[in-house]
Amino acid sequence: MVPFSPETPLSGVGHILQPDEYLWYRRSVTLPEGFFRGGRLLLHFGAVDQCCTVWVNGQEAGSHTGGYLPFALDVTELIEGDAFTLELRVTDPTDTGSLSRGKQRLKNTGIWYTPQSGIWQTVWMECVPENYLRSLRITPKPEENAVHIRLEADDPAMAAVTICRDGGIIAEGQTDENGESTLTIPAEELRLWSPEEPFLYDVAITLAGGDKVESYFGMRAFGIGKDEKGCRGCC
């Protein structure tokens, strides 16, 4: 469970974190029996506002800057057994720094918006294989009846890629040594995405070693160009 940020009344603190102050979190964690079955242990944070450093069992696990993006830390080597201590230190410059902050200000003028600091998204643990999918980028190319897949992993080569429509496989392929693959969608299976008909294809990626990720995409391209009158705009 993620606690309320210290600026909120429900936190019981009711204090606006100042740029020269630290916000600390500390708790003991016990993993469910049989949770770690080998491979790697990842500690995920949905978002922490704004800059943070993480310790596991007193050892620094990593740090992150930016209050709006998720991040993950590999804590496998820092945990022995099923129990560990997690500590987090947060700083938040709000409008005294150069980081993205939205409407947040230490001194609000003309708007009733309280700054928020610390953990504000879900925190969770994940057990993954040694060779796991770190990131996946899907780039539709409707003008070529194709889709480009790019993934990141320790060993991204020879990953199986499957594209399905309405539960049936319509394209299959494998990634090269760089983790890339371009698959052609048969013309009779091509269906463009639109706001009126937001059709999505299903895609599954299976790495050598067993890690599997399922996602989806729509066939649509966006860009900047000239219309029939010669005016530049989104197309």
Name each model feature, range by range:
Residues 15, 19-132:
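Accessory beta-strand-rich segments of carbohydrate-active enzymes
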Residues 54-56, 145-175, 181-183:
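Beta-strand-rich binding/interaction modules
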